[in-house]
Amino acid sequence: MKLSPIPFALALLALAPLAGHAQPAGQEGRLAQLYAPRPPAGSAFVRVLNPGSAALKVAVGNGAEQSIGPATRATRYAIVEGGKPFTLRVAGTPRSQPKVVAGSFSTLVLDPAAPSKPLLALADGGGTSDALKAEIRFYNLASGCPQGRLAMANKGAVVFPAVAAGSSSARGINPVKARLVAGCGGKESAPVALPALQPGDHYSLFLTGSATAPILQGQLSGTDAVGR
């Protein structure tokens, strides 16, 4: 995954020859990210996801505390040192997390019924490497839903036919407007409209709730600034 400011800016540079000398509004700011500090060599990227109905305060490593829950499901990806354990704080209580591989992106899923339990670790790799595409990643975190499904609204094309409970799947897409629904069995969520994604963007779609009352929410993925 290429979520940190430097790879994202490099993806924009790959598009620059197509644009000639004209620069759309806001592009100068994006290209300026090239000059932002890079994460240290050997870094890994970790975020925490809360699929529950109650918000919790969470911090990863040296990152700032963030509130995650129904309004915002996941934290930003925090930068941690790969190959070494790191600290996680949930509702003010610190805990040590096992090491993660350098260069990897991971999502740690809280158990909303028991936040003190070990977190489910999901690897967020294996997505698109095409700089001309955006990436969407679908997480099946609905209770009692052995196979989650994501499709275009109004009985449109199926995007992910069967994502196992407690797992995710990703694919590259052309940045287009779309309305998506998710569900389990014969039940579907309310539709969610994709935002105006740019090439190189990564967008998460979370299926929460239950098999009988599925909820679909989306969130643009991002990383903490270097040094936070």
What are these model-predicted stretches?
Residues 18-22:
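Sec/Tat signal peptide C-region and signal peptidase I cleavage site
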Residues 8-17:
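Hydrophobic helical h-region of N-terminal Sec-dependent signal peptides
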Residues 23-228:
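Intrinsically disordered, low-complexity polar regions and short flexible loop motifs
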Residues 1-8:
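Bacterial N-terminal signal peptides that target proteins for export
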